[in-house]
Amino acid sequence: MEQDRASDVPPAKKRRRPTVVCTNCKRRKSKCDRLKPVCGNCLRLGDETTCAYGLEPAGEARKPGVSRLVAQCFEMVRSTQPTLIDLQPNGVLIQCKRSCTSYIAPLTPSAAKQRDPYLQALGLVCQLKRTMRAADPAPKKEGTAEATSRGSLPNSMRYIESIEQNSPEQPASLASRHKNMCRQLFTKFGKYRRNHTSSTEDDLKALPSRVPAKKVFFRHIWPYFWSHLSGLCPIFDEAQLEKSLKRVYDRFSPDTHSKLDVEDYACFSIVLLITCLVQLSLKFAQDYTEENTNSESSIVMGIDTSKFISMVNGCISRKKGDRKCSLLRLQSLLLLRFYYWCAPDDGDGDYLQHSNMLMGKIVAACYSMGIEWQCVRDPEEFVNNFNLCLGLMPLEAEYDASDYKKIWTTVLHWDRKLSLLTGQRCLIGNSIKLPTPGHESPSCALLKFDSLILKICDMISNDPRRVDATAVIRLLETLRQSLKKDTRENIVNPALGFEWGMVIALLELTITHAHMVHSEKTESPDEFCDCIQGLFEKVLQITKICEQYLYSQEGLDPSARFYTNKIVDIAFSSISAIFPSLILRSGRSIEPHTKTTLLNFYRDILSASFNTIGVEYYSCFRRMFPSKLVFRTLSAAGDEDPWTRILEFIVSSDYNKEFALLQRSGIFKQFFKSYEKTGNVESAASLWSAYYAPNDLYSFDLDVKSFGLQMPFSHSNRYNDYDVFEAFFNNAKTLFLAKVPNLPALNGTALGQGAFNYFDYSLLQGIENFDSADFLDFFEPGGSEALVELESQESPSNHDIC
């Protein structure tokens, strides 16, 4: 009877839930921190691919005699669900110009503008009309050096000179100060262009006499470089490099006329580059050092380095430079790549793409010389093989594997950094896991993180259409904590640690913005609220760092600011491109005055950027003009919703012709079809809300009122006397700015007036063939992200321009 009753009771169901600890930690019987998608133990031990939190199949009990190890081989392992986002929803973007064709990598600011439908529409609305005109003959190269520099600017820029020459003298007022600023900036940036296109054949023939004198170099330049700058680009052995440079100086003394060989060109290139770098360091450190400029600094700053980079490029191409390479030539290539990153002229281009070919040459040279992971993995064996291949005794060899190891570490640093900033595939596609001991020297400290960094890069570049945002953010946080620890312990150079921290923050900013756009397209309101709040907080974090960097006298070594200025410039570029997405969505905010607060914050960011970085760096300065158009477009109607005005303008235009690019987006294509059924301009905003992102579901609250007191740059009165951002480009008008007072949402409201709206530019009127669009083209090549050129049958309107 008892046996029958027991048989009637159903068997107990096995509880099915994910394991609390990961399967690896459970097998190792180690404490698991339970982090997902990869726990700390698996990340440290290199078991990222097998770290999972599995489910044990229900109703499948292990039979007697079957070992747990064998049973575990057949268990179903189910990892956490990934959060896949699309970084290229509109496809692969290619920009074609006369000079080059560029791939718009998925993490660049330009890609963010094309990924977000709000920013995509804003960019098209902010475009100036493009017209064609014949080029005027260049002015004769006579007169002062200042006039010659301005003559190196494009044709449309030469009319700025007529303002300076023909304007009557004015007292020391705001207008005269603005005119002087125009003269200084255009002369300086014109000089950059002239130096890059100047002929250097005669200079190369007399190269030994063009470099700094031996006494000046080794007394004033060399000590500064080695004590302050060598740690930023650790590719040299001090004793060996000094020996090589002194030897080439002695060979080419004024009394000798030897013929230059491969190593001579490489040594002179290094001398020229070191001189340029020391001069840049001294220039940007002046405002952050209490000491007055001493005589040694004056000597270095007095050296004319205007043709040095052109001479370096000429040296590198000599003696079969594309077919053969030596260690010194490779080091000169790396130093040139370092200079392009730091230089205030063209630098790496709008998309950080101008040095890609140089990096490819550097990586190929490394492989041809045997500089790769083997010199890190087996340094002792590598040294023996290296010396024997030279046919020298070990004591006679000038270099050893430590030089190769430092070079390989530096190449990896540049390759991984550019991949994280742009989303392009790494040129070096493999890595190895290294034990921590033995790799803690400052020059090789980043090697132990390379495997993790490469994994992050591959998660983005392998398939930008399917990126696991959760996994990327998780791995970035692990990388941040590891770098933070090493930076505090001075294992990593502080300037490099600061740079990597900014790189991680900027990648998080881009991923968060892409996730926000993805949540709207996939109709996930909860994810959207989390993402837009996280995006705003990330902007606050980065701008706070930039504020402390620009205005604080403490922190980084002033001599390294010429290097770290670049990553701050990239940060400003990314924020100025992404932040308008918050302003355009401010109409959904349930908090009053959100748009006004965000717009004021945006103005403060732009003002700080262009008054500090913009007056020194050519790439930043030319971004000011499209940024000014964006700011004027967003602030065109006071407290009204800017997105409503943009939609009304688009649908009231011939959007099939003037906004043809939007037709490629499925979102706008269906929006236009729906609008054609109603035909009511005033209903455009409500139609968009009903179709794409309903205001009731996608409303948000950023709590800007409490954040307002903490927003960076908000309490700065540094530019009350003269603000470069406020002064320039006030009178140029797009079709939107000309039409905006007549849109239904504004009811004829006039645009606001600023102090510089009254600046006299009447001298520009009446000049034959003058076109303001060419002025903008100079500073933003290809116009406002000219992935497609808008056609226009109308005659170009006259625009006032500053």
Curated annotation (Swiss-Prot):
One GO CC annotation, please? mitochondrion
- Molecular function terms in GO for this entry? DNA-binding transcription factor activity, RNA polymerase II-specific; RNA polymerase II cis-regulatory region sequence-specific DNA binding; zinc ion binding
Cell location: Cytoplasm; Nucleus; Mitochondrion
Q: Which InterPro entries match?
A: OAF3, Transcription_factor_dom_fun, Zn2-C6_fun-type_DNA-bd_sf, Zn2Cys6_DnaBD
Q: Pfam families recorded for this chain?
A: Fungal_trans, Zn_clus
One GO biological process term: DNA-templated transcription
Q: Which protein family is named in the record?
A: Belongs to the OAF3 family.
What name does the UniProt record give this protein? Oleate activated transcription factor 3
Q: Provide the organism lineage as a comma list.
A: Eukaryota, Fungi, Dikarya, Ascomycota, Saccharomycotina
